[in-house]
Amino acid sequence: MSPVVILLILVGALAHATWNLVVKRSAISGPTFVWLTAVGAGIVLLPIGVVVALLEPPSWPDLALAAAVSAVLHVGYFLALQAGYRAGDVGVVYPLARGTGPLLSVVFAIVLFGERPGPLGLLGAAAVIAGVVVIGLGGGRANWRAARAGVFWGLAIGVVIAAYTLWDAHAVTALAVSPILLNAGTSTMEAVLMTPIAVRRWPTVRGVLRRHWRDVVVVAVLSPLSYILILFAMRLAPVSVVAPAREISVVFVALAGWLLFKEPHPVARLSGAVVVVAGVALLAASR
């Protein structure tokens, strides 16, 4: 990979880890927080998107399709993420969610397309599974009982991550949609989709904004920024290389979960996160 791609991946991973830690802190706010961050991201990205569209007019039907599908998937992702962070530790949910996507891509390739992974692919899949087991069971039975809900949500979120990663990669490559326009359109449609919920809960929305406006701003900026950086990296390097490399963020989050939130079993969870990253890297090397 070129230095530019490496820089894009590292900055994107750090930004992604940061906003997830903020979401964990605000997880009790639920769908209203998700709506507020979508509105905030739209406010930030729409003016930039207008300039990009004027300078390089897109195919509007392709952009509309790409943004609509991505918005549905991302709404599901953010709602599941909120539920996961309410139910479990960030040091469990985040690594499992980020490691499940690449593993599922291998499973889908075997089941749907009849592909047969080589030794590296099988070793990578085994490493991801081993990392999941270490995170869930590393502290013994007591840790498993405490981590069970987080494990469930982490795996469920990973399914959604696999879906939106494949779709968005298709949008910026095959459909040639600008990453900035895709994110601007997606954030706008996310806000539109969730507006009925926000209207029904308007007093709650006002309360969340009053208490968590700083968190809303951080997530509204860093969430699209982290993803835009990765999408640009996907334009410069193969998706099979970029997608696994960005998972270095799981180590950042596992460490932060211990340092910031005093989550238990830091050695087991950090070790499991490192094993997951290694497994994802092996999956990438096998392609």
Locations of regions flagged by a protein language model:
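Membrane-interface interhelical linkers
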Residues: 1-14, 18-69, 78-90, 137-155, ...
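Selected transmembrane alpha-helices and immediately adjacent juxtamembrane segments
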Residues: 147-181
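Hydrophobic transmembrane alpha-helices of multi-pass small-molecule transport proteins
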Residues: 45, 106-110, 119-139, 268-287
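Structural signature of transmembrane alpha-helices in multi-pass secondary transporters
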Residues: 12, 37, 41, 94-101, ...
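Specific alpha-helical transmembrane segments that line the substrate/conduction pathway
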Residues: 69-74, 85-133, 181-189, 239-259
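Hydrophobic/small/kink-forming positions within alpha-helical transmembrane segments
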Residues: 13-17, 46, 71-79, 99-107, ...
